[in-house]
Amino acid sequence: MQEDKSNATEWIMDTGCTSHMTGDRSLLMEQTLRPPTKDHIVFADKSSRKVLGLGRVAISRDRHMENVILVESLGYNLMSISMLCDLDMLVIFGKF
């Protein structure tokens, strides 16, 4: 995965992503991260990045995502569709 130097504030809904991920520490609600469950994330292109910890991210005033992985030098925010479906959330795709 190529590094994107932009400070992304939008989330990409990813059907191939198994966890919510960000590279932006400022998005996490906690000052102290929870310990990661794995050391590295391997992407589809076989590149890998170091996992720095886990936290929560607010997506609105009253909603947040749990167990968001903070990934070193990740220039994207990835929202896992499979994690949303595991929470019985309905995800609908369509044309604009």
Spans of features found by a protein language model:
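Anionic group-binding determinants
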Residues: 1-96
